[in-house]
A protein has these predicted regions:
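Bacterial N-terminal signal peptides that target proteins for export
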Residues: 2-14
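C-terminal, active-site-flanking charged/polar segments
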Residues: 439-443, 448, 461-523
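A short, hydrophobic/aromatic-rich structural module that often spans a beta strand
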Residues: 275-299, 322-337, 353-370, 418-422, ...
Length: 563
């Protein structure tokens, strides 16, 4: 492959003794003009770390070069817009949401009709100033479902009285292939819906770096502050070919890998627009460039799922080849924003909590996955906390897994940013990380488990290729790591505890940027510090527990599961 693995050295790059071919040649790089696209403080000190706290208590960012370049022109992006209402906003208190429908458990029979009817009754009520309609409360006890519960309207909250075995337990008898216990939202195209007047315009920059928040376009006429826009990265044959990331041999095509990232315009200056959140994947003219257009998505919002235990069929087998005798997925979110899942435990399923297209600005917290079913080591089984589709700006925090395969996992072409914060996996049998096909902009912040890998998966599956780029492992503790650098992109690991290893598929790929290996860094949480920098200490208090602010909470996560 005709590129040079030359990266800018940023801080003390700690590597273990592996074959020399696994690691890049590091050299000082020249600053690039693209640095004008950033709004965050730049640390120009020689060998500066990727991210560090400055003397003023705010983060400073060193620029780095992507694989194949010697130009330090990219920045670790700000992930802090992830979560409900764009991060830093408390979820609505339970007491502030009126209970409209109350159901008691039945001794026997199918509870689906009456629960769905209660949801539908709340769905037609008038929304309040917050966009909320009210809650359906399922009293403590056991409920049975013959079909998938669905929430299709904004402002509906489905609430129980606890996620433990003595709380509100919903047992699903759905047995359709890929069946779900609870479906929230709906399907949506991976291409964001264009506005009536989209004002599509080409990006007028040779290179839009990772971390950029300003983009110059051919014409910004008609763009206004507050517009929702899609940044389209439109690769060409060169990008998937030998001069690029060399994945055409895995049956990747340019049209399949156009990726759309939604942002909000915060300023317009001539033909330069400022965005509310940074770019997660560089856009280069030589690899196809990109465009911008105004969007008008149709999604629901202000939906809450809380204080429940969702269960599949405990009789479903656990060995490879198990047939679909119970629901496959517990909960799936799509075409939904500014919503939440809190204090929910799932049990006896394959997949736990899953997003799909259109899931944005959602928080899933204090959630757990127990006693999985379906194939113990079989492919496409036991994905626990899964970002799929064009999901972006989602936060999963304080999550716990026991027995899954892929715990903190990303599907194909997920644009990000998305965050896992303060999460623990126990007994996971395979790796966490991006699973396939160029997902970008994921932060694994204080996760703990078995393996955490960002690598070229080559022909695995149906041609997984490069699984992910711009994946940040921050103060994580896993037994084994793989941190490879994709061509013309990068992956990072800072403060990791655990052994680094060559990739499973092509071990010869050069490593990404690894700093402070074996020694955790300050700040403890990148997400929370970025949030603090952007919105202040109260924003951090709004979205965390006191124990979380004091330090690591892994040891306490299992206690809240409600076994």
């Amino acid at each position: 492959m005709p590129f040079l693995p030359a990266f800018r050295r940023v801080a003390a790059l700690t590597l273990v003794a592996l074959p020399a071919c696994l690691f890049p040649t590091l050299s000082a790089a020249k600053p690039a003009s693209e640095t004008g696209a950033f709004i965050h403080p730049i640390n120009n000190a020689e060998d500066a770390p990727l991210v560090e706290l400055g003397s003023n208590g705010l983060l400073r960012y060193a620029l780095y070069s992507e694989r194949g370049s010697d130009h330090a022109r990219n920045m670790v992006p700000d992930f802090s817009r992830a979560g409900y209402q764009g991060g830093g906003v408390s979820l609505p208190t339970r007491s502030s949401i009126p209970v409209i429908e109350v159901l008691e458990p039945n001794a026997e029979g199918d509870d689906y009709p009456r629960i769905q009817a209660a949801i539908d009754a709340v769905a037609v009520r008038v929304q309040d100033s917050r966009g909320l309609r009210g809650a359906v409360l399922l009293r403590r006890g056991r409920y049975r479902l013959s079909k998938t519960l669905t929430i299709r309207a904004s402002g509906v909250v489905l609430r129980g009285e606890g996620r433990g075995a003595d709380g509100t337990v919903i047992r699903s008898e759905v047995s359709d292939r890929q069946g779900r216990i609870l479906e929230v939202g709906s399907s949506e195209s991976a291409v964001p819906r264009a506005a009536l007047d989209p004002r599509r315009t080409a990006i007028n920059m040779d290179y839009v770096p990772v971390g950029a928040m300003l983009i110059t376009v051919k014409s910004a006429a008609g763009y206004r502050v507050g517009d929702t826009v899609s940044i389209a990265r439109e690769p060409n044959a060169r990008w998937v070919g030998p001069e690029g990331i060399d994945t055409a041999r895995y049956r990747w095509t340019p049209s399949d890998y156009a990726v759309y990232s939604e942002r909000v315009v915060t300023a317009v200056d001539h033909d330069t627009i400022t965005l509310d959140a940074p770019i997660m994947d560089a856009i280069a003219t030589r690899f196809g460039g990109g465009s911008v257009y105004r969007t008008d998505p149709i999604r629901i919002s202000q939906v809450g799922i809380e204080d429940l235990r969702l269960e599949g069929n405990p009789e479903t087998g656990t060995v490879n080849g198990t047939t679909d005798s119970g629901p496959f997925t517990a909960l799936r979110l799509g075409a939904i924003y500014n919503s939440w899942v809190r204090d929910v435990t799932v049990r006896y399923v394959s997949h736990g909590f899953v997003t799909r297209n259109g899931a944005q600005f959602n928080t899933l917290q204090d959630i757990a996955y127990l006693d999985p079913r379906y194939g113990e080591t079989q492919g496409a089984r036991r994905y626990v906390f899964l970002y799929e589709g064009n999901a972006a700006f989602n936060l999963i925090q304080r999550c716990y897994n026991q027995g899954g395969r892929h715990t903190f996992v990303i599907g194909a072409r997920v644009p990000g940013p998305n965050v896992f914060l303060d999460c623990l996996a126990v007994g996971d049998s395979n790796d966490s990380g991006p699973h396939h096909r160029w997902s970008t902009g994921t932060l694994y912040d204080n996760t703990k488990g078995y393996m955490l890998r960002a690598q070229n998966r080559r022909y695995s599956g149906t041609g997984h290729g490069w699984a992910g780029a711009q994946q940040m492992f921050w103060n994580t503790e896993h037994d084994i790591y793989v941190v490879q650098a994709p061509p013309f992109a990068m992956n990072w690991s800072v403060g990791q505890v655990g052994a680094i290893a060559p990739g499973k598929f092509p071990p010869e790929e050069p490593a990404g940027i690894v700093q402070s290996m074996g020694q955790m860094v300050t700040p403890r949480s990148l997400y929370l510090q970025q949030l603090r920098d952007r919105l202040g200490e109260q924003a951090v208090i709004n979205v965390t527990t006191e124990a979380q602010r004091d330090g690591r909470i892994w040891d306490s996560l299992a206690a809240g599961v409600g076994e």
